[in-house]
Amino acid sequence: MKILICGLPGSGKTWLAKRLADDIENCAWYNADVIRTASNDWDFSAEGRARQANRMTTFADFEVSNGRSVICDFVAPTEHSRISFKPDYLIWLDTIKEGRVVKEKKEELEAAKDLPFEVESLEISEAFKDTTKMFETPNNANKVIKSFLSDEEIKNLALEIQNV
C-alpha cells in the first residue's frame, strides 16, 4: 500500500505521517525534507520539484516491491505530481491556506549542515509563496483532513487504510 500525505508547508504532513506509520503494520515512512537533505537538492524550480517527486516515487515503489506499506509525506502541489506518484491512498491535509515554516521545522533545518540558504529566509521565502500559488486542490483524495487528529482518530484512520 502506497500512501501519500500532501498539503501545504506547515499543514501537519510530517506530524501525521510519523504517527500513522506507527499504527500501520510493516510500514516505512519517507519525509520529503529528509530526502531533499540526503540528496542535497533544495531546488524548488519545476525541474527540482519533478526530481523530488521522482525520488519519493522511487523510494515508495521500492518498499511496496518488498512487501511493505509506505507513507510518503510531501507537498505534491500539482495534480500531475500526485498522479505520477500513483498512491493507493491519498490524504490531503487542508489545514492551512498559506504555506509556512513552523518553529519545529526551522529548528530541524537549523541543525542540518551545508544548506544552500539561510533557514531564517524560509519564513518569507518566495518558494513557499510559489508553492501556495501553484497548489492545486486534490480531486481524488481518499481522505481530506481539516484539523489535527487525536490519537484515537489516527488509529481509526490506520485501520481504514489497512482495510482498503
PLM region spans:
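Glycine-rich phosphate-binding loop used to anchor ATP phosphates in small-molecule kinases
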Residues: 47-98
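Conserved substrate/cofactor phosphate-moiety recognition/catalytic segment
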Residues: 17-58
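ATP-binding Walker
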Residues: 11
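Walker A/P-loop
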Residues: 14
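Small-molecule kinase domains that catalyze NTP-dependent phosphoryl transfer to phosphate-bearing small molecules
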Residues: 84, 93-164
